């Protein structure tokens, strides 16, 4: 991937969903998407939009399940993980490494700061910042 950065302003949850839908069209299996941002800034909403574009229903926050796997009709898996409640040892026990670069999945990780062995190849970083109660800045960095 080429290094690039795009900044979007979302004014509502619907805007964030739509941005996720559009972003999904740019994804290829094997990519890891790292989602940075405080609680409530739209990370899971964005992934739900990706899921909708992939024809995956019922994308929910993995805050308590830690990892959710969804299979699209095309056979590509959407893997969605939330590391918020884990320390480094707990993250390693999840086995996320098996999804890195996998030819049949895209991996989304919320709170990647908690992941010591964070991947560096084929990674997209997305930063969510609350500008107001409803407005979000969403910065997408491809490396």
What do the PLM-derived regions correspond to, one by one?
Residues 38:
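P-loop (Walker A) phosphate-binding loop of NTP-binding proteins
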Residues 33-35:
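Hydrophobic anchor at the beta1->P-loop junction of P-loop NTPases
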Residues 56-70:
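Short beta-strand-centered segment that lines the nucleotide-binding/catalytic pocket of NTP-utilizing
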Residues 6, 89-143:
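Short phosphate-coordinating micro-motif centered on Lys-Gly-acidic
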Residues 2-22:
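N-terminal pre-Walker A segment at the start of P-loop NTPase domains
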Residues 43:
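Conserved lysine of the Walker
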Residues 24-30:
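Phosphate-binding P-loop
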């Amino acid at each position: 991937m080429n290094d690039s950065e795009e900044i979007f302003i979302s004014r509502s949850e619907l805007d964030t969903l739509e941005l996720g839908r559009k972003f999904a069209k740019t994804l290829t299996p094997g990519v890891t998407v790292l989602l940075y941002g405080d609680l409530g800034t739209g990370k899971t909403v964005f992934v739900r939009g990706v899921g909708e574009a992939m024809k995956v229903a019922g994308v929910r926050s993995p805050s308590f399940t830690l990892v959710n796997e969804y299979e699209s009709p095309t056979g590509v898996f959407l893997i969605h993980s939330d590391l918020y409640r884990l320390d480094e040892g707990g993250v390693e026990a999840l086995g996320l490494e098996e999804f890195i670069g996998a030819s049949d999945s895209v991996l989304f990780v919320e709170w990647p700061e908690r992941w010591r062995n964070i991947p560096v190849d084929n990674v997209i970083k997305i930063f969510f910042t609350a500008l107001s109660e409803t407005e979000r800045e969403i910065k997408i960095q491809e490396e």
